[in-house]
Amino acid sequence: MERRGWILHCRAGYEKTLAAEAIAAAATRGVYGYCRARPQSAYVVFEAPAGDAPPLPPPLTFARAGLGLITELTDLPEGRRAEAIAAALPRGLGAAEPWMEHPDSDEGRPLARFCRRFASPARRALKAAGVTSGTPDQRLHLLFPNSRHCFVGLAPSGRWPAGIPRLRMPRNAPSRSVLKLEEALHRLVPEPERPYPGEHAVDLGAAPGGWTWLMRERGTTVTAVDNGPLATEVADDPGVEHHRADAFRFRTRGEVDWLLCDVVDRPQGIARLMLQWLRADRARAAIFNLKLPMRRPLDIVQRTLHDLAAVGAQAQAAQLYHDREEVTVYARRAPSRSSH
């Protein structure tokens, strides 16, 4: 099936940044196109006029989720939307039951009720038309910017709808920052590489202790570095050693498994600090946040990823759902030859 392009979900306000990233990423793969990116819409549509776009977009820092664009439908008739969508799609598409999605924007969130109510009629119509088959391999997505306008996309099953994770705030967690790290572990870190009991982490700028708390939940001991106080439940944990020190000056004597950093500072300074630890073999892996500048945020991300690669680290960055004006980076130092 010819793919017209991609549908990309993002944080509202970052459409222009994501569009630039998508166009550049497509060009490196020999695919040329353009983006429709309306400010504050929380989604971007990349279109390849030649119809030669890959089925799915590559990993993009500023995309929460990406779908292969099948078609766009406008002026859907009220009362017969489901039938109109089913009629526009080929039989035997081989997709699981569809997900109804709306943009995560001020304009899009009021459509949540419509999407919930429309789900059953859409599933019935698509199944009756022979479009969906219940296969678990890929899923149909219907994205509604408004109730009469629909983008139809296809993506592998199992992803979060619209890239929004369904994570619950743990009752005993000291801060909501725990959700940011939890999402990063799910989205950026392959399961075999995630923290496990017996490993040790350093958490720079730890207070009040959200990231430290989550690492302890996973059985990892933690050195928490912050001049400020930790929450009582974190400070009293025997698996936590609190160092009242400056995050930029603290160093360990040996190597640690994990380096964590959610310090509010200039992104260049945070990136430099992470590079120092990884270059000196003080940490095997790092998860850190970069607070984004107002202008050209993609530049600092790409520069950081380039610099990490130069010191032998494999890295990926993402603007998570629980991130705000920031991106989260996961970097892991490649094993040395002597370790094999």
Which role does the model predict for each range below?
Residues 1-340:
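SAM-dependent transferase fold signal centered on methyltransferase-like domains
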